[in-house]
Amino acid sequence: MPSARLLVLFGSQTGTAQDVSERLGREARRRQLSCRVEELDSYPVVNLINEPLVIFVCATTGQGDPPDNMKSFWRFIFRRSLPSTALRQMDFAVLGLGDSSYAKFNFVAKKLHRRLLQLGGSALLPVCLGDDQHELGPDAAIDPWLQDLWEKVLGPHPVPLNLDLSPPGVLWPSKFTLQFLKDTPSSGPEELCAAGTDPQGPPSELQPFLAPMVSNQRVTGPSHFQDVRLIEFDISGSGISFAAGDLVLIQPENTASHVQQFCQALGLDPEQHFTLQPREPGVTCPTRLPQPCSVRRLVSQYLDIASVPRRSFFELLACLSPHELEREKLWEFGSARGQEELCEYCTRPRRTALEVLCDFPHTAAAVPPDYLLDLLPLIRPRAFSIASSLRAHPSRLQILVAVVQYQTRLREPRRGLCSSWLASLDPAQGPVRVPLWVRSGGLTFPKTPDVPVIMVGPGTGVAPFRAAIQERVAQGETGNVLFFGCRRRDQDFYWEAEWEQLQARGCLTLVTAFSREQEQKVYVQHRLRALGPLVWELLDGRGAHFYLAGNAKYMPADVCDTLLSIFREEGGLSDPDAAAYLAQLQRTLRFQTETWA
């Protein structure tokens, strides 16, 4: 009896959905199921009509948005021309990953589940709603859901009687092998370009532009709790162009001290070079990784040793461990019953993969190099809103970066990999180059002259609006209204002098909210409500566009509630009509958001 064919497709923004998908793949193979795990946008979506059994694993980002690596699939699957019987041969299940503190919790998974039903698919289970806010994380929902899933899958597709279920402790072969070279290659392996890429092509993830850093300036007061940087890059000769609302992606690196510590813990020679080979046909090597590559470069620029490891990290370490006590503890962390203890040890204090390896020294020293890419995720690029316009700053690109640093119960402060790396770079001490490329963002501004724009950007959320205002002022457009919020005027009022100069010229209406300068906190939504008549007149009378950028947790919902109250009180709309009015603004792209966690 041939084994059933299972396809796992994932859409992942931070790597969690990919990690869950690979876990699904391992568990399927334990059950003798033929299984492929693929990124949604890499899979030829028209082939779904031939798939009998598909598990979709998808995260929800921002305000109910799909991850970047499933956006093409998302557009295709919601085409109105698709027939209602298109997927009638397919059994499916949807596993969602989200955060219940956001208004559109697991919106992508829920909407995909409904759409697959509309196209004739048969759901094996209700959609799984993994929640980052749960004390045990998404696994609290995933573990029982997977038990039900395998029962459903193995009903119509039972394990052949002559085959046994592989025990969970079996060590599967690594995805890749590292072939170490006897001699150091002579052809410049440290150039930042992946083998086989076209150096003449436009800057991209495969071929980033090494942009010289021109300046790195702290723009918050010395006593302010947060270090925020205005960083400028020279993009002359790069071929990079961008518009207001676009994003720049930056590929960060691990610190030299962490790289050295990692190599010592695993007994690796950082100067040794290797080539990477896939173990199975059909598996491709990471496209960004050069061939050949040094161990130092692999650890510095590719392996995310500063990430908080997921459950699969502990499962694999347990399989690799030769030390009985360490192995038992790792098995506990990797098991369903050990998730509360894992949360206490790792997730809650944000302990990094490097710190875990140092806590399990006998295991770390026994990790075969072939398993490095199975054990650790690749460093992901970080996206920043571009904070300048080429019209105002030709050949320059500026970003506003809040340096992430916070304390947990661990002795060492937790630091954001990319923001801390950028903050550490000082062009005054010598040339600094940063790998970057640009992509279209989620905000598009009106091309028609004289269309007013209302922009709400508290904190670093103001960055894309500075680019938009510079661009619009250069084109002679004066209908710019900016609501900016921060803690104190003298500590974190970004670009104060620039805004005041534009306001004096009649190019900008600036409305500020300084939350800590009076006994009762004042936020942007309070200032928005106070100017309700102006907001309603601009939106309903003059066809203004409304933009919102900043932290996704509470502010967007508060601003939307404020808008609804303005529509009711200034426009005389009923509750349903106010909600419909806001929905219409969203549909026509007159209400746009760019938010982040």
From Swiss-Prot:
Residues annotated for NADP(+) binding in this entry: 460, 515-516, 521-525, 558
UniProt enzyme class: oxidoreductase
Record InterPro entries: CysJ-like_FAD-binding (IPR003097), FAD-bd_FR_type (IPR017927), Flavdoxin-like (IPR001094), Flavodoxin/NO_synth (IPR008254), Flavoprot_Pyr_Nucl_cyt_Rdtase (IPR001709), Flavoprotein-like_sf (IPR029039), FNR_nucleotide-bd (IPR039261), NADPH_Cyt_P450_Rdtase_alpha (IPR023173)
Main location: cytoplasm
Localisation: Cytoplasm, Perinuclear region
Domain Flavodoxin-like span(s) in chain numbering: 6-150
Residues binding FMN: 12-17, 59-62, 97-106, 132
Gene Ontology biological process terms, A to Z: iron-sulfur cluster assembly
Annotated GO CC locations: cytosol; perinuclear region of cytoplasm
Domain (FAD-binding FR-type) ranges: 206-446
Co-factor requirement: FAD; FMN
Binding positions for FAD per the UniProt entry: 350, 382-385, 416-419, 596
UniProt keyword list: Cytoplasm, FAD, Flavoprotein, FMN, NADP, Oxidoreductase
Reaction catalysed by this enzyme: 2 oxidized [2Fe-2S]-[protein] + NADPH = 2 reduced [2Fe-2S]-[protein] + NADP(+) + H(+)
An annotated Gene Ontology molecular function: NADPH-hemoprotein reductase activity
Function, in words: NADPH-dependent reductase which is a central component of the cytosolic iron-sulfur (Fe-S) protein assembly (CIA) machinery. Transfers electrons from NADPH via its FAD and FMN prosthetic groups to the [2Fe-2S] cluster of CIAPIN1, another key component of the CIA machinery. In turn, this reduced cluster provides electrons for assembly of cytosolic iron-sulfur cluster proteins. It can also reduce the [2Fe-2S] cluster of CISD1 and activate this protein implicated in Fe/S cluster repair. In vitro can fully activate methionine synthase/MTR in the presence of soluble cytochrome b5/CYB5A.
Oligomer and partners: Interacts with CIAPIN1; as part of the cytosolic iron-sulfur (Fe-S) protein assembly (CIA) machinery. Interacts with DCPS.
HAMAP family per record: NDOR1
Family per similarity comment: Belongs to the NADPH-dependent diflavin oxidoreductase NDOR1 family. In the N-terminal section; belongs to the flavodoxin family.
Name this protein carries in UniProt: NADPH-dependent diflavin oxidoreductase 1
GN (gene name): NDOR1
